[in-house]
Amino acid sequence: MQDQRNLLVFSGNANKPLAQSICKELGVRMGKALVTRFSDGEVQVEIEESVRRQEVFVIQPTCAPSAENLMELLVLIDALKRASAQSVTAVIPYFGYSRQDRRMRSSRVPITAKVAAKMICAMEADRVLTVDLHADQIQGFFDVPVDNVYASPLLLADIWRAYGTDNLIVVSPDVGGVVRARAVAKRLDDADLAIIDKRRPRANVATVMNIIGDVQGKTCVLVDDLVDTAGTLCAAAAALKQRGALKVVAYITHPVLSGPAVDNINNSQLDELVVTDTIPLSEAARTCAKIRQLSVAELLAETIRRIAFGESVSSLYVD
């Protein structure tokens, strides 16, 4: 193994188990830092070891509670920069606020993904590493290099192992996800592709799900970047089963799973939901028989190693 004495990994409180798994994959210990709260709730951070001239990686998804976790990340970066770290890479497995990435129809709303990116850059982070951004263009909101790595190799390997490619069809849950679904289908021996076209015929009429493609008697694999309340996902599963699908499974990178998500999944016709550990699961999600979690620790550890030693990251994804 290459010399990793100048590589340090720190973590906020958002996803300590993932950070520990990454350290184990890298063969390094977790950096010593106090990340807690003052009595009034303000974030308190103290780096408890020297980081001078070290290559530092801070692992902190900005999942719920988003504001607190983002603030922890910002304060950690600032503390490390002030302690003379050679470079600080913000490792953000799930980049919260990413869905607020544009002004629809020029409405009077913020572009919060840009706000979060500017705040991270203002703390003088040297680089950002993230997984499956909601939109690739968000990389342009940052003034520093961004490595947006994809969980697809991990998810594809599991699809091959669990379901094979016989009688399988990849399904995009909406028109916007067609590019992602097509890429997955290509890697599954050019599997068939179906698209769910959601539309509301007129005001006060329920949304209709039109399925473009033949799913009769097939195992349907829905692919997407995140699942929130799972309402749309569960409705899609019901529509696919109604059209004769044999089985409906979903492979989704980020398990936001807010509100009634777990209940929705338990009561749905979805056979299995496979997610990653970019966001920690709640107790209800961990005990849900339909939810299975894969780890991105090995993927992120290898990417961190390549960044630290000046190797290509893009070659991880060359076909």
Swiss-Prot record:
Active site: K198
UniProt-listed PROSITE patterns: PRPP_SYNTHASE
InterPro entries registered for this protein in UniProt: PRib_PP_synth_CS, Pribosyltran_N, PRibTrfase_dom, PRTase-like, Rib-P_diPkinase, Rib-P_diPkinase_bac
Binding-site residues for Mg(2+) 2, renumbered to this chain: D174
Annotated positions binding ATP: D40, G41, E42, R99, Q100
Binding-site residues, D-ribose 5-phosphate: R200, D224, D228, T229, A230, G231, T232
UniProt cross-references to Pfam families, sorted A to Z: Pribosyl_synth (PF14572), Pribosyltran_N (PF13793)
MF terms (GO), sorted A to Z: ATP binding; kinase activity; magnesium ion binding; ribose phosphate diphosphokinase activity
EC number: 2.7.6.1
Keywords: ATP-binding, Cytoplasm, Kinase, Magnesium, Metal-binding, Nucleotide biosynthesis, Nucleotide-binding, Transferase
Chief subcellular location: cytoplasm
Residues that bind Mg(2+) 1: H134
Catalytic activity: D-ribose 5-phosphate + ATP = 5-phospho-alpha-D-ribose 1-diphosphate + AMP + H(+)
PANTHER family the record matches: RIBOSE-PHOSPHATE DIPHOSPHOKINASE FAMILY MEMBER, RIBOSE-PHOSPHATE PYROPHOSPHOKINASE 1, CHLOROPLASTIC
Role summary: Involved in the biosynthesis of the central metabolite phospho-alpha-D-ribosyl-1-pyrophosphate (PRPP) via the transfer of pyrophosphoryl group from ATP to 1-hydroxyl of ribose-5-phosphate (Rib-5-P).
Subunit structure: Homohexamer.
HAMAP family: RibP_PPkinase_B (MF_00583_B)
Family of this protein: Belongs to the ribose-phosphate pyrophosphokinase family. Class I subfamily.
Name assigned to this protein: Ribose-phosphate pyrophosphokinase
Organism: Xanthomonas axonopodis pv. citri (strain 306)
